[in-house]
Amino acid sequence: MRLGLDIGGTKIEAVVIDNAGEIVYRERCATPKQSYGDFFQAVTEMISKARLAVNQSLSVGVGVPGAVDSEGLIKNSNILVLNQQAFAQDLERALGI
């Protein structure tokens, strides 16, 4: 099973698909914009909820607005709290990758 996260300026959507490509779980929440900590917590909670819902480990793919520079920092995101953050590295650390 695979988890896809679509992170946008208004919402974060999590979708889990099975090996046949069928959606087995979907959830949305508003994108927190007050702080990077709040934003990051929302993302990790979405991943945890998805894992619990399907009761197994998941591979995770994430789409975020903006570009990533050579140092792994997000640039030009419409989610201002993401700019200058090493989101991928932070997420890898949180997931134990």
Where do the protein language model's features map onto the residues?
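Short glycine-rich, Thr/Ser-proximal phosphate-binding strand/loop in the N-terminal lobe
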Residues: R2-Q41, E45, L73-I74
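Short beta-strand segments
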Residues: D6, G61-P65
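Short coil-to-beta-strand
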Residues: D18-N19, S59-G61
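Short glycine-rich anion-binding loops that position phosphate/pyrophosphate groups of nucleotides
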Residues: T10, P65-V68
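Glycine-rich phosphate-binding loop and adjoining helix at the ATP-binding site
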Residues: Q41-T44, S48, Q56-S59, V68-I97
